[in-house]
Amino acid sequence: MAHPGLPGVMFQPTVLVLAAGQGERFRAAGGHTDKLQSLLTTARGTRTVLEHVVAAVQASGLPWHVVTAQETRHHAVQGMGTSIATGVAATRHAPGWLILPADLPLVRPESLRAVAQALAQHVTVAPTVQGQRGHPVGLQALCRDELLALRGDQGARVVLQRHAPHLLALEDVGCVLDVDTPDLLAQAQRLAGPFAP
């Protein structure tokens, strides 16, 4: 389900929260639950990883859509590319998209707004944190057909190779710290501060 953004703001790309993955790396590394359902305690309370991401997206004021496994199940080939194409198809009239994997629980709302603002001036945008590329990656509607054609694990990398992204330096480790393993989840908890129960 798509959620509207702020009224009166001209350029509002839709944040696509990619939550259809299987979390295989997390389980293979010893995780006992779906990584998106793992708990993380921050100043805002104890929530699942997915709830932290959705809270940041909501706080950004941008329109958003969560791509779930249920939405992508009719595709023969699963993966990030399929999730992106499914999300773009569900929000095809958006002026652009911010692609946000749902395993980045520390991403800040202001980072989402910064990428959206830069996307108003550039066809594609990729945030960097201390030289490391991160998410969300922004793509204008000019890329719609290319995004709709993605399948499997292809992701948006092929589109970004055709449309070199504007690199936006941010100071938000939440843009680069995914929780693909239990160790990374523990690192995210340490960075979130002394809020653990």
Feature annotation, model-predicted:
Residues V67-A76, V173-G174:
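Short beta->alpha junction loops
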Residues A2-V15, R151-P197:
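Conserved alpha/beta core of the MobA/IspD/sugar-nucleotide pyrophosphorylase nucleotidyltransferase superfamily
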Residues G31-K35, L40-R44, T48, H74-T82, ...:
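Residues at secondary-structure transition points
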